[in-house]
């Protein structure tokens, strides 16, 4: 889907350099079709980088996707210019009376922070409660998965003693699931998290369908039977160099991190890594848009009355 974004958004030029089809609002306005309305709650500190990554994954299909960016943290950002936030982001109050076809909630570097100590935890709870009645399908990524499992299912925070970082192999567990349609039986995906997602825990606490997991028994991809919510515990949106940037940042901070697993050629941080997960990342988001959003959302969003009860 060509993504529909404001003409001045920096991602437009960035993605066009990669030959990614981005449709500006001015061009999209002359097409007489209803675009899918997708809201992205961006919790990452480097918001522009994260925008580029998610918009890239949402761009590869023939229908329009109208993107709106949401922020819920009113504190001054150290990583994103205030002008960018003011120009391209909305607050919850701006959209709380609207309905959306899809919602994506990104990860956040909060793996070692207790939920009640997260500055915007009440706002996260508010958005998830709102989404039950106002969004057709919501996709949670990495830390947002842990937050959603706690809010929606009461699952306690599970934290690993050591951060998992690297590119790990996973296998699909339901061969005919729509969200993994077109996937290889085994595939790679990057992870960067302290959160722990044992598949057994998900099965014990919920009726969610686990669609893919790691060889170590960690759930990677799972979803509700009604397609209203989906969870991906890794970072399929990451660029080839994102894990490297995190690793060298931690090295410079004196944290002595482990070299990301299965990432640098010959496990040598001086060598340039390559993205080995890109095709499955694209498939995941394309499948979510098609089967979890487009196929079940109403044409007239005013008539939507979904429920997770």
Curated annotation (Swiss-Prot):
Listed GO MF terms: homoserine O-acetyltransferase activity; homoserine O-succinyltransferase activity
GO CC annotation: cytoplasm
Residues with site note (Important for acyl-CoA specificity): 111
Binding annotation for substrate: 163, 192, 249
Keywords: Acyltransferase, Amino-acid biosynthesis, Cytoplasm, Methionine biosynthesis, Transferase
Pfam families per UniProt: HTS (PF04204)
Signal sequence segment: none
Alphabetical GO biological process terms: L-methionine biosynthetic process from homoserine via O-succinyl-L-homoserine and cystathionine
Subcellular location(s) per record: Cytoplasm
Catalytic activity: L-homoserine + succinyl-CoA = O-succinyl-L-homoserine + CoA
Site feature (Important for substrate specificity) residues: 192
Main location as per UniProt: cytoplasm
Annotated catalytic residues: 142, 235, 237
EC number(s) stated in the UniProt entry for this protein: 2.3.1.46
EC class of the enzyme, as a word: transferase
Pathway: Amino-acid biosynthesis; L-methionine biosynthesis via de novo pathway; O-succinyl-L-homoserine from L-homoserine: step 1/1
Superkingdom of origin organism: Bacteria
Annotated function: Transfers a succinyl group from succinyl-CoA to L-homoserine, forming succinyl-L-homoserine.
Family that this chain belongs to: Belongs to the MetA family.
Full protein name: Homoserine O-succinyltransferase
């Amino acid at each position: 889907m060509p993504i529909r974004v404001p003409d001045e958004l920096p991602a437009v030029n960035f993605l066009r350099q990669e030959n990614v089809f981005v449709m500006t609002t001015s061009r999209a306005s002359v097409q007489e079709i209803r675009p899918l309305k997708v809201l992205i709650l961006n919790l990452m500190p480097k918001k522009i980088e994260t925008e580029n990554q998610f918009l890239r994954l949402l761009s590869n299909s023939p229908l329009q996707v109208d993107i709106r960016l949401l922020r819920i943290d009113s504190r001054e950002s150290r990583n994103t210019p205030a002008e960018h936030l003011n120009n391209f982001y909305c607050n919850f109050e701006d959209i709380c009376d609207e309905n959306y076809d899809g919602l994506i909630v990104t990860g956040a570097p909060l793996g070692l922070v207790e939920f009640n100590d997260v500055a915007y935890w009440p706002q996260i709870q508010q958005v998830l409660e709102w989404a039950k009645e106002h969004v057709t399908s919501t996709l949670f990524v990495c830390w947002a998965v842990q937050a959603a499992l706690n809010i929606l299912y009461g699952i306690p925070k599970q934290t690993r003693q050591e951060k998992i970082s690297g590119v790990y192999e996973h296998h699909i567990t339901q061969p005919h699931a729509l969200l993994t349609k077109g996937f290889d039986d085994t595939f790679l995906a990057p992870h960067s998290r302290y959160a722990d997602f044992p598949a057994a825990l998900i099965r014990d606490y919920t009726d969610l369908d686990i669609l893919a997991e790691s060889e170590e028994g960690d759930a990677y991809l799972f979803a509700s039977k009604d397609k209203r919510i989906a969870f991906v515990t890794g970072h399929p949106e990451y660029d080839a160099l994102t894990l490297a940037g995190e690793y060298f940042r931690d090295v410079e901070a004196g944290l002595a991190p482990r070299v990301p697993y299965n990432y640098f050629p010959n496990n040598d941080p001086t060598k340039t890594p390559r993205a080995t997960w890109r095709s499955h990342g694209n498939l995941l988001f394309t499948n979510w848009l098609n089967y979890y959003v487009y196929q079940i959302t109403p044409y007239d969003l005013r008539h939507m009355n979904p429920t997770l009860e």
